[in-house]
């Protein structure tokens, strides 16, 4: 399935009132597909929060800027930069010290979603596989459940991105 088809399906899902989806992307094009997907959503005037567990937000911002995406209503929760020593000066990014701090992820999403101007809004996790490295499966399932319920109440569409080849049955079932 092409990323354009995936994006179209997600937009239809958002317009239909759905609140949560898991999108499984191939490892060979994962980063490129994430950028394309978020660019399409921003192009449709959705606002969003991008939670990155696999790469520093500064890299993602640079790639989105290169793709000419409008970043005026996009914010980041970065679980990587403080761990690897990346740039932590971006005003639209909240940095978390460790990917194990799942409660902080929810708190920071809540803080950032208040800044969103768009009527239709999303939160995207790049990727859930990154969280799987740091958290026990049971804890991660509970987190995904709380996240889904919290975002539904806030009317934020949640996309959990996974790397197809790295997603086991237990994570896929979460």
Kindly give the residue locations of the regions a language model identified.
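Conserved beta-strand segments of the P-loop GTPase G domain that flank and frequently precede/overlap
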Residues: 21-26, 50-52, 77-79, 96-97, ...
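Short acidic, S/G/P-rich loop/turn micro-motifs used as interaction or catalytic elements
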Residues: 27-31, 56-57, 83, 129-137, ...
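Loop/turn-to-beta-strand initiation segments
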Residues: 47, 73-75, 119-122, 152-161
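Glycine-rich, charge-decorated loop segments at or immediately adjacent to ligand/cofactor-binding or catalytic sites
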Residues: 58-64, 160-174
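Long, charge-dense
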Residues: 60, 64-103
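Phosphate-binding/switch loop-helix module in NTP-utilizing enzymes
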Residues: 85-146
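Substrate-engagement module of ASCE P-loop NTPases
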Residues: 135, 139-166
């Amino acid at each position: 399935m092409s990323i354009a088809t995936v994006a179209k399906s997600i937009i239809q899902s958002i317009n239909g009132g759905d609140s949560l989806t898991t999108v499984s992307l191939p490892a060979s094009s994962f980063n490129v597909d994430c950028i394309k997907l978020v660019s399409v959503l921003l192009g449709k005037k959705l606002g969003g929060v991008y939670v990155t567990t696999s790469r520093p937000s500064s890299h993602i911002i640079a790639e989105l800027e290169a793709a000419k995406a409008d970043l005026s209503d996009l914010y980041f929760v970065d679980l990587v930069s403080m761990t690897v020593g990346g740039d932590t000066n971006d005003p639209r990014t909240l940095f978390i010290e460790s990917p194990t701090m799942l409660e902080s992820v929810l708190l920071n999403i809540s803080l950032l979603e208040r800044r969103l101007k768009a009527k239709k809004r999303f939160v995207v996790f790049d990727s859930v596989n990154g969280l799987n490295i740091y958290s026990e499966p049971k804890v991660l399932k509970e987190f995904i459940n709380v996240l889904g319920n919290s975002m539904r109440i806030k009317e934020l569409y949640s996309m959990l991105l996974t790397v197809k080849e790295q997603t086991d049955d237990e994570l896929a079932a979460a």
